[in-house]
UniProtKB/Swiss-Prot annotation:
UniProt-listed InterPro entries: Nucleotide-bd_a/b_plait_sf, Ribosomal_uL23-like, Ribosomal_uL23/eL15/eS24_sf
Gene encoding the protein: rplW
Signal peptide: none
Protein name: Large ribosomal subunit protein uL23
Alphabetized Pfam families for the sequence: Ribosomal_L23 (PF00276)
Species annotation: Alkaliphilus oremlandii (strain OhILAs) (Clostridium oremlandii (strain OhILAs))
């Protein structure tokens, strides 16, 4: 899992994550096995920014019904990345 693109799966675009962008906090879905150090290195490598801290949380998949059958969505990991004050913003999120 040394490739940064294997660690960062996708950005999370919600109202709460958009509000956090004002304080330079960005939310990503990351690989379930990745730790905070790997997430920090991946964000710095992919986006060319300086990361101050990383908060991670394991999200449990919801139980959903499909007709008479019951299934479960996959568990996943969420990371909230806080950038340093002197760092530039991530260009991917600009214009949203």
């Amino acid at each position: 899992m040394t490739n940064p693109h294997d660690i960062i799966i996708k950005p999370i675009i919600t109202e709460n994550s958009m509000d956090d962008m004002a304080s330079k906090k960005y939310t990503f879905a990351v690989n379930k096995k990745a730790n905070k150090i790997q997430v920090k290195q991946a964000v710095e490598a992919v986006f060319g920014v300086k990361v101050e801290k990383v908060n991670t949380m394991n999200m449990i998949g919801k139980v959903k019904r499909m007709g008479a059958k019951e299934g479960k969505r996959a568990d996943w990991k969420k990371a909230i990345v806080t950038l340093r004050p002197d760092s530039k913003e991530i260009e991917f999120f600009e214009g949203m």
